[in-house]
Amino acid sequence: MEYFGKLLQVLDRLCPISGVFEKALKPLIIQKEVGTVKNMLREGEVQQQIWFVVSGLVREISSSADTVSGRTSWFWYAGDFVFAHPGFFAGLPSLVEIEAYPGTVLLELSRLDLALLIQNFQEGSVLIETLRYRNQAARSAHTSDLVNLKHAEMVRRYYHEHKVVFLTARAKDIASFLGIKDNGIHRFLRGL
């Protein structure tokens, strides 16, 4: 599997992994390529897989009283692990939907196989706690930006950190993620 090496690099940065763990993990991974926009998880479902983004973009959609289609509450990029927050690790019904954009390549691990890895390998639980911590820290930083930054600064910063999102995602998805009205994001993008 050509993308397994990328997964191992990311895992090893989170926690040193043993050769035995690597051998146990490899046959459990399934590669998925997204051809069209794909809803991977619906609100109320229990997520049965965790995904690793090899390339492409995945978004989280939260219910919103002000829009029928919901709002983009999170993006996952290449090198990220995709899981419903909260809910996945507790096995609870998801409060969000997860959607992958066309061209996204994912590696998938079932919830059951993940549980066995956590149970049988010391690094399994360390990896999970590190993933949860990093996810929560990134979400907290984003919430802080939404509260503390002006829209123009937030768009500028996000554009420079994640240009690929602007080539892949719909403007309305980016706008809702940044807390901006759909039609307002274009004026902030001028001059970038």
Predicted stretch roles:
Residues 1-30, 87:
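Cyclic nucleotide-binding regulatory module and flanking cytosolic helices
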Residues 30-45, 66-67, 76-80:
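Conserved short histidine dyad/triad with adjacent acidic residue
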Residues 149-192:
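Phosphate-/nucleic-acid-contacting segments
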Residues 83, 141-154:
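Short, Lys/Arg-enriched anionic-surface-contact patches
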Residues 71-130:
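Cyclic-nucleotide recognition modules
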Residues 61, 84-85, 116-117, 158, ...:
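Residues that scaffold the ATP/ADP-binding catalytic core of kinase and kinase-like folds
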Residues 48-63, 79:
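Glycine- and acidic-residue-biased ligand/ion/polar-headgroup-sensing regions
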